[in-house]
Amino acid sequence: MQNKGVVLTLFLVVSMAIVISSTKEKRAVIQKKYVDFKDRKYPWKEECFETCARTFTNGDQSKVSEVVPDYFKCICYVLI
């Protein structure tokens, strides 16, 4: 009977730790930001990725979730 209590307690502690850690990961926010692009009217998507990553994440393209080329600018969706 004591083994069941120990196993149940251990299960509850581990499940609470998983819930707490997953809650912290979900706090990341995607922000919409703008970057001016003066080289051409409508920049290529790769250029927007590079420009957004360089401007907002010190070159880390994995934090840039999406980019939208626009008239002389790039719209960046950045994970903060």
UniProtKB/Swiss-Prot annotation:
Keyword field contains Disulfide bond: yes
Claim: Signal is one of the keywords in the record: yes
Localization terms from the record: Secreted
Gene Ontology molecular-function annotations: toxin activity
Changes after translation: Contains 2 disulfide bonds.
Leader sequence residues: 1-22
Keywords for the protein's UniProt record, in alphabetical order: Disulfide bond, Secreted, Signal, Toxin
Tissue specificity remark: Expressed by the venom gland.
GO cellular component assignments: extracellular region
Family: Belongs to the scoloptoxin-15 family.
Protein name: U-scoloptoxin(15)-Er1a
